Amino acid sequence: MTNIFSLEGKTAIVIGGTSGIGRTLSLGLADAGADVIASSRRQAQVDETAAEIERHSRQTLRLCSDVCNRASLEALLAAAVQRFAKIDILINCAGIIKRTTTLTMPEEEWDDVLDTNLTGTLRSCQIFGKHMLERGYGRIVNIASLNSFVALKDVAAYAASKSGVVSLARSLAVEWAKRGVTVNAIAPGVFRTALNADLLDNTPRGQELLMRTPVGRFGKTEEIVGAAVYLCSDAASFVTGHTLVVDGGFLASGVNQ
């Protein structure tokens, strides 16, 4: 029986794919059979993640990119196509968050977050999406957030950007539906990573988030891999414009104790 979840023979690019959830997704796609280029701004992280992908017996390239720099994304595409001839899968996982009250937030901070999280996703979709449309095949997955749907304090710019990521996925899905390219999003719940451990561990904010998660714990980054593999595989060939929430029941919940 054919494994409709296999990514054998596919080439994937994961933008922001060298740390946190992005790194886990890069390695998860490699486990599913794809050759994976995990790219970010930091060469040391790119090299480390590439070495791990190679230990999974998959091919890769060691290339940095910056979603705020269109030329760097274009260079990434050119190098990837030269090496692999095609790009089948794109995951947009690059993102930043800055915590401040909306009233005191500098406009420059708003611009930084929106340019990285939303406009950066648009740039990537435009550049890699054009290649996919020319080939008549592609799977794009944009990483959204619980903040795409609910408000948490002091992250207005982040919430606005991630709401936009969901809307962008829907818009592109409709535009590209008849041209062989699906565009979806994944909205992770509260996942413990090195970047947010200080916020989640033994703080009132962390306890509040934990209380609102019905499964009673924070997510492990590997628990998001299945959602990504599904959306990138032939199993999801009729799924586009969808946001798959992986949140331990957070959005379904009221207050749980």
PLM segments and residue spans:
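Substrate-binding pocket helix/loop in short-chain dehydrogenase/reductase
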Residues: 101-102, 106-114, 140, 209
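Alpha-helical segment proximal to the catalytic Tyr-Lys
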Residues: 130, 174-178, 237
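Active-site helix of classical SDR
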Residues: 125, 161, 169
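Short C-terminal tail/terminal secondary-structure segment
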Residues: 2-3, 150, 229, 240-257
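Residue(s) in the substrate-gating loop at a strand-loop-helix junction
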Residues: 145
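Active-site loop immediately N-terminal to the catalytic Tyr-X3-Lys motif
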Residues: 103, 150-156, 178-179, 216, ...
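Conserved glycine-rich cofactor-binding loop
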Residues: 11, 18-19
